Regions:
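An extracytoplasmic/periplasmic, membrane-proximal ligand-sensing/linker region
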Residues: 35-37, 223-225, 249-250, 257, ...
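Conserved hydrophobic/amphipathic secondary-structure segments
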Residues: 27-269, 337-342
Length: 344
């Protein structure tokens, strides 16, 4: 074999060997990075609600699936319906894979209320996946003057919420608009726990509670029928709530696309993302760890014991939904804003 040919062949062998070894090298690099590190699960809510429930389960099970087995801690950064936490992760937060956001539907804030201090672009986050679709319901205390949808037309009912940029405000507002209802919708209750306490005390009659919040933190309320669930806000009825209609079912024809837009965003209320600057090999490792965790029998058993659901989507499916929402027409966005009381 001529010298040049032998040299070319040797170079090709070296290149193939390097390619074959690169995943192992990258994996070792990721393991070296995470070994002895602390990874923070960032939440845009205070302690005590459904996000806190999920975060504690992930903190317990996710570390063993991340190379290097880092410690996981939980950080609460409530405010503006998750926007403050989203801004932090996108900008000043570390871009090395040591901080991960358990997101609200921050994509809605970007599309529907970009002037409310939004400094991130959802499509530039590294989406790890979604672990469920947040199942908001409209729940009323058993002593409240509300037993049917018709009772919400009388103008004497008070519904509480986190903030105008949050689902807890937007869903009741859209329900009121789509069905021609008349009730007072107020803000100022920043967590699920504060809304539940206000409802129990009679300060408010009800709120758009997530099913996970109720069944996870107040299971006795469900068992003892302390709350009345009138409606749920999903594309399809949740299997645990077969007799509770969705707003999409009840919406008139001229509101269907508006309600469907909001309903399609519910998976992002249970998303996991990293900042846009995290190295690709660490993003890949976190995605692999996420999928291993949500398939892990021990994780699923803990979720079952704590009465939270897991219906996960991988990063590719999640990203396809992101693109669909950020690509919605200006006309549809304007009508959605009007329906949720956030028109400019």
């Amino acid at each position: 074999m001529p010298l040049r040919t032998r040299a070319s062949a040797l170079a090709a062998v070296i290149a193939v060997a390097a390619l074959a070894a690169s995943p192992a090298v990258a994996q070792q690099s990721v393991a070296d990075f995470y070994k002895g590190k602390t990874v923070t699960l960032l939440l845009g809510t205070g302690p005590g609600g459904s996000y806190d429930l999920y975060a504690r389960i992930f903190a317990e099970h996710l570390p063993r699936h991340i190379p290097g087995n880092p410690t996981i801690v939980i950080e609460h950064m409530p405010g503006a319906g998750g926007v403050i936490a989203g801004n932090h992760l996108y900008g000043p937060g570390p871009q090395d894979g040591t901080k991960v956001l358990l997101s609200h539907a921050i994509i809605n804030a970007e599309v529907l209320n970009p002037k409310a201090g939004v400094r991130f672009q959802s499509a530039k986050f590294n989406w790890i996946g979604t672990y469920d679709a947040i199942a908001h319901t409209i729940a009323f205390w058993h002593a409240a003057p509300v037993k049917t949808i018709a009772d919400l037309k009388k103008g004497n009912v008070i519904v509480g919420s986190f903030a105008k940029a949050h689902f807890t405000y937007q869903w009741p507002a859209m329900m009121r608009d789509a069905l021609g209802l008349d009730f007072k919708l107020i803000t100022g209750y920043p967590t699920g726990s504060t809304n539940n306490l206000a409802m129990e005390r009679g300060e408010i009659h009800g709120w758009a509670a997530s099913w996970e919040n109720l069944i996870g933190t107040r299971p006795q309320w469900i068992a003892e029928k302390k709350v009345t669930l009138l409606m749920q806000f999903l594309l399809e009825r949740k299997r645990q709530l077969p007799d509770v209609p969705t707003l999409l079912e009840m919406a008139p024809a001229n509101k269907k696309d508006v309600v469907e837009f909001m309903s399609a965003s519910t998976p992002f209320g249970r998303g996991i993302v990293t900042g846009p600057g995290v190295p690709a090999e660490r993003v890949a490792a976190l995605r692999k760890a996420f999928e291993a965790t949500v398939k892990d029998p021990a994780f699923l058993e803990t979720a079952k014991q704590r009465k939270v659901d897991v219906e996960w989507r991988d990063h590719q499916h999640t990203m396809s939904l992101v693109k669909k929402i950020v690509g919605a027409s200006p006309d549809l966005i304007a009508r959605v804003k009007k329906s949720i009381g956030q028109e400019e």
